[in-house]
C-alpha cells in the first residue's frame, strides 16, 4: 500500500500529524512576525492591517508580541500533537503497558541491559524468587531440577516418557509477562473423577508443546514465546533421572517423593544414572552469569540435585559469577529436621566438594506464634541464621527480614527482590553507564513489584 496506507480512515494518526503541521506553521508565522521577515506575505499583511485598524497605528512592539504568542501556541500544539501521535502508536504496538511512556521505555532498556542472573533450584521456592527477578533484569535463566516423580508431573513422566514439567511450569509462569487470567489457566488443576483429574493444565500444555515441537527444549522455547517470558527456563538435564539418598544409618532411599517419607537424616544425595549429562544451555548459563543464585527451595530434593548432573558442579566452581545462597526460612520435615542456616550451607559445600559461595542471605525475622502453630503437627521449625558460623567459612552473610505477611511462613518475593537488588547494585553489576540512574530504576522496579498480588 505504501504511503497511501497513511490516508486510510480509522488509524488515528492523520489528525495528530495535521495538528503537528498546524503547530509548525504557527511557529513559522511567529518567527516571521518577531523578526519582521516576510515569510508568509498575505498572512502577515492581514495581521498588519488588523493591527492598524484596531490601534490606529503601526506598532512594531505589538507585532513582535504577537509573534511570540504565535510561537508559544505553535510550539504547544506541536508538543501536544507529538505526544498524542506517540501514544496512539504505542497503544497499538504495546497495548497492555501501564504507566508513562518514558517510564516504560526506561524500564525496558534497563531490564534488557541488566545483569545476567542464573538461578539454580526447583520447587515453589525457585518460582517465588523468580517473581521478583523479572523486575531486575530480562537476562535471567532458571536452571531447574527434573527429578520430580510425584503428582501430575510423575504421571506424565511415566505415561509420555518426558521429563517432569511441574517445576518448569512454575518457573515459566513466574517469569511470564502475563495477564492474571493466563496465570490461573496455567496453574489450573482438573477436578473430578476423569482421567484428567489431578493434572495441571500447564503441565499438559508443556507436554503438548514438547511433542508438537519435537522435544522438551523446543517446547519450552515455544511456551516462553507464548507467555512472553522475561528470561529463560532450562532443565538441568533432559535424561530420565532418579534421586537417591544415603541416610546416616547407611540405608538408601530412591525417589524424590519417597525420600522425605522415611524421616531419617540424609548424609549424601546421589543420582541415577550417575553420568546424566546437562541439557544444552544449562552449563552456558552458569558460566556466562554475572550472578549465580542457589535456592530457596528444598535443599536435598530441589537445589542439590542440579549439582549432581554431569558438568554442572564443575561449571559452578569455574564460573566467575558472584555466588549467592538464599537459605530457607523453615526446616523441611524428612529433609532438614534440626538444621540451621549453617547446616544448609555446609551441605551445599559438601556436595560441590569445595567452598564456592560468596554470600548467604538468611532470614532474621521472627515467626509469630500463630504462624508456628500451623507447623507444629508436621514438625517444621524456623531456621536459625547462624551468622557467625557461616562467616567462619569465609562467606559474607546478609541477614534480612524476609517472611511474608500471610499465614504461611515463606519468603516474600518483594522483600527478597529488594535485598537482591540492593546487593547487586552494591556490587555494580548493572553494567556500564550512569550508575546514578540505577537508583531510580530500582525504585520503579520495586513499585511495580509491590503492586503485584
For each predicted feature, which ranges?
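Glycine-rich phosphate/diphosphate-binding loops and the adjacent beta-loop-alpha structural elements
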Residues: 185-211, 297-304, 330-336, 367, ...
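Active-site gating loop/helix substructures
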Residues: 235, 239-298
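N-terminal signal-anchor transmembrane helix
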Residues: 87-118
Amino acid at each position: 500500500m505504501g504511503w497511501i496506507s497513511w490516508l486510510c480512515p480509522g488509524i488515528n494518526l492523520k489528525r495528530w500529524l495535521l495538528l503537528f503541521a498546524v503547530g509548525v506553521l504557527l511557529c513559522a508565522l511567529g518567527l516571521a512576525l518577531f523578526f519582521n521577515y516576510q515569510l508568509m506575505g498575505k498572512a502577515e499583511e492581514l495581521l498588519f492591517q488588523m493591527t492598524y485598524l484596531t490601534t490606529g497605528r503601526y506598532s512594531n512592539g505589538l507585532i513582535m508580541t504577537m509573534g511570540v504568542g504565535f510561537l508559544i501556541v505553535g510550539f504547544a500544539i506541536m508538543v501536544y500533537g507529538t505526544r498524542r501521535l506517540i501514544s496512539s502508536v504505542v497503544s497499538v504496538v504495546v497495548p497492555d503497558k501501564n504507566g508513562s511512556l518514558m517510564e516504560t521505555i526506561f524500564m525496558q532498556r534497563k531490564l534488557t541491559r541488566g545483569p545476567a542472573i542464573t538461578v539454580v533450584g526447583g520447587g515453589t521456592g525457585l518460582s517465588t524468587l523468580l517473581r521478583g527477578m523479572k523486575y531486575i533484569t530480562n537476562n535471567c535463566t532458571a536452571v531447574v531440577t527434573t527429578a520430580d516423580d510425584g503428582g501430575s508431573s510423575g504421571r506424565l513422566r511415566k505415561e509420555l516418557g518426558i521429563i517432569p514439567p511441574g517445576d518448569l511450569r512454575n518457573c515459566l509462569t513466574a517469569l511470564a509477562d502475563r495477564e492474571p487470567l493466563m496465570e490461573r489457566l496455567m496453574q489450573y488443576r482438573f477436578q473430578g473423577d476423569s482421567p484428567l483429574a489431578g493434572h495441571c493444565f500447564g503441565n499438559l500444555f508443556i507436554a503438548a508443546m514438547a511433542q508438537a515441537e519435537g522435544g522438551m527444549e523446543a517446547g519450552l522455547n515455544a511456551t516462553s514465546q507464548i507467555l512472553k517470558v522475561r528470561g529463560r527456563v532450562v532443565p538441568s538435564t533432559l535424561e530420565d533421572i532418579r534421586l537417591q539418598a544415603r541416610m546416616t544409618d547407611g540405608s538408601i532411599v530412591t525417589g524424590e517423593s519417597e525420600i522425605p517419607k522415611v524421616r531419617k537424616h540424609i548424609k549424601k544425595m546421589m543420582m541415577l544414572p550417575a553420568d546424566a549429562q546437562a541439557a544444552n544451555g544449562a552449563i552456558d548459563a552458569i558460566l556466562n552469569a554475572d550472578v549465580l543464585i542457589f535456592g530457596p527451595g528444598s535443599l536435598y530434593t530441589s537445589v542439590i540435585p542440579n549439582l549432581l548432573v554431569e558438568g554442572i558442579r564443575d561449571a559452578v566452581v569455574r564460573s566467575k559469577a558472584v555466588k549467592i545462597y538464599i537459605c530457607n526460612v523453615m526446616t523441611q520435615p524428612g529433609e532438614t529436621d534440626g538444621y540451621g542456616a549453617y547446616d544448609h550451607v555446609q551441605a551445599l559445600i559438601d556436595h560441590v566438594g569445595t567452598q564456592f559461595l560468596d554470600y548467604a542471605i538468611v532470614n532474621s525475622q521472627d515467626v509469630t506464634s500463630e504462624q508456628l502453630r500451623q507447623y507444629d503437627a508436621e514438625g517444621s521449625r524456623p531456621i536459625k541464621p547462624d551468622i557467625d558460623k557461616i562467616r567462619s567459612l569465609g562467606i559474607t552473610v546478609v541477614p534480612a527480614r524476609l517472611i511474608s505477611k500471610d499465614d504461611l511462613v515463606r519468603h516474600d518475593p518483594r522483600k527478597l527482590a529488594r535485598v537482591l537488588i540492593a546487593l547487586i547494585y552494591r556490587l555494580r553489576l548493572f553494567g556500564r553507564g550512569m550508575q546514578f540512574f540505577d537508583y531510580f530504576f530500582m525504585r520503579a522496579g520495586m513499585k511495580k513489584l509491590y503492586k503485584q498480588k
